[in-house]
């Protein structure tokens, strides 16, 4: 790779996709999607791995252009394998895994997660994973 190409890659913002397994998504999921649209750091694809097409209702999710829904059966669902399958639909540099009831508290979630990858250890070690804290709803 040429030095010019390395510089271009260093200046390019990492692309971010979000993978969300769902089962009977409701109002909280709709709020989650709306908060992902408001993020200060752009989200590429929102990849939804929905269990049981019969429980999917487009109402409330229209107009979200980067929403990619893939349906699977209950028999196909597995916590790890479903997330892995969802990740295969992404070509992003960073993939954020969320649950369908985890609504970001503010518009900085993705920005802060991406920022973690810019950090380096004392000897130049790179961050390979970052996570965010999830707060319970007030009614829990």
Named regions from a protein language model:
Residues 49-59, 102-103:
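A conserved acidic beta->alpha catalytic loop
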Residues 73-90:
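Glycine-rich, basic loop-to-helix element that forms the pyrophosphate-binding segment
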Residues 25-38:
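Short, well-formed alpha-helical segments that are part of the catalytic scaffolds
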Residues 95:
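Short aromatic/hydrophobic "clamp" motif used to bind/position activated sugar donors
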Residues 107-140:
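Conserved donor NDP-sugar-binding/catalytic core segment of glycosyltransferases
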Residues 72, 98-100:
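Catalytic metal- and UDP-sugar-binding loop of GT-A-like glycosyltransferases, i.e.
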Residues 14-17, 45:
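Cell-envelope/extracellular polymer assembly enzymes that use nucleotide-activated donors
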Residues 43-53, 72:
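Short beta-strand/loop segment that forms part of the nucleotide-sugar
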């Amino acid at each position: 790779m040429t030095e010019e190409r390395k510089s271009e890659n260093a200046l390019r913002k990492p692309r971010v996709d979000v993978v969300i397994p769902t089962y009977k998504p409701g109002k909280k999921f709709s709020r989650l999607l709306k908060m992902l649209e408001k993020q200060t750091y752009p989200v590429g694809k929102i990849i939804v791995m929905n269990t049981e097409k019969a429980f999917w209702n487009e109402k409330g999710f229209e107009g979200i252009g980067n929403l990619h829904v893939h349906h699977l059966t209950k028999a196909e669902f597995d916590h790890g394998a479903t997330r892995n399958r969802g990740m295969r639909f992404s070509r992003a540099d960073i993939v954020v895994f969320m649950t369908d009831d985890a609504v970001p508290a503010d518009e900085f979630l993705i920005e802060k997660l991406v920022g973690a990858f810019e950090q380096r250890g004392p000897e130049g070690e790179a961050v390979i994973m970052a996570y965010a804290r999830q707060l319970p709803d007030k009614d829990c």
